[in-house]
Regions:
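Alpha-helical repeat scaffolds
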Residues: 3-14, 36-48, 72-85, 110-125, ...
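Internal metal/ion-chelating core segments
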Residues: 1-70
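Residue at a conserved register position within TPR or TPR-like alpha-solenoid repeats
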Residues: 29-30, 67, 101-104, 108, ...
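C-terminal non-catalytic interaction modules
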Residues: 101, 153-157, 171-242
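Non-catalytic interaction/regulatory modules that flank or connect domains
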Residues: 131-134, 138-151
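A conserved active-site cap/scaffold subdomain adjacent to cofactor or substrate pockets
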Residues: 55, 60-122, 135-137
């Protein structure tokens, strides 16, 4: 699958070297390979970023992940501060920033000042409950602050929204058990772990936050070992930083 994705991305870039979605596909491959060669690609470095919208910041997020995987934390923070940190209220920008900073936090890097700057955006999204993808980022964002008020009202507010929309099954079968496990310290069902949380939305690079956050916060060694095992089976570079 990875080889096919790489081939398709490269073929597409031969037709249009300015197609950011093709670069995005290639970066997914590079993330998995721990490959930073895109930084030396002449076509990539010639891109006029000023004409593009949020997708460019998502691409820079992918670049920062490669630096993270290589334990170049200061370089990755510089990329965050100079490029993909955004003052716009767009859900993907918030999710990108949140997931990146939490990764660094789990490695012992002080990100509190940067996390604090995301609070207004978190407040904007936290009661909407329109996408499980946004909500799982919010859950781990507020867990960083140990915000018990947020978690006490979370399930009730989510149920009001998700039980009435098309994400009902996604919420009941996947998101709710994660919340319940975190609140009660109960074991997370092994089948949920084996699903790689794909029904909560986003690519594996984005859902990676769920794995890393649960590994970091679970109180059960069985949950931790199951999460690490499933994660290592998928992510070829995972042993570098889990």
């Amino acid at each position: 699958m990875i080889d096919k994705a790489k081939l398709l991305a490269l073929n597409s870039l031969k037709q249009s070297s300015n197609d950011l979605w093709s670069w995005h596909a290639l970066l997914h491959v590079h993330d998995n390979e721990n490959n930073d060669s895109i930084n030396n690609n002449d076509d990539f470095n010639k891109i006029n970023w000023s004409i593009y919208g949020p997708i460019k910041r998502h691409i820079w997020w992918h670049q920062s992940l490669i630096l993270f995987y290589n334990q170049e934390y200061e370089k990755s923070l510089k990329l965050f501060d100079n490029y993909f940190s955004s003052s716009e209220i767009f859900y993907l920008d918030f999710c990108n920033a949140c997931s990146f900073l939490l990764r660094l936090h789990y490695k012992g890097v002080d990100v509190k000042e940067r996390m604090d700057k995301l609070k207004d955006y978190a407040e904007y999204f936290k009661n909407q409950h329109i996408l499980p993808f946004i909500d799982y980022h919010l859950i781990f964002y507020y867990l960083y602050y140990n915000d018990q008020d947020y978690f006490q009202q979370l399930e009730e507010k989510m149920e009001e929204n998700y039980l009435e929309n098309s994400f009902k099954e996604n919420y009941i079968n996947y998101l709710k058990p994660i919340i319940h496990s975190m609140k009660t310290n109960e074991l997370l069902n092994e089948n949920i772990i084996k699903s790689q949380f794909k029904y909560l939305g986003g690519s594996f690079a984005q859902r990676e936050l769920i794995f890393l956050s649960l590994i970091q916060n679970t109180k059960y060694e069985k949950n931790k070992s199951d999460l690490i095992s499933e994660y290592n089976d998928y992510k070829s570079v995972s042993k570098l930083y889990v």
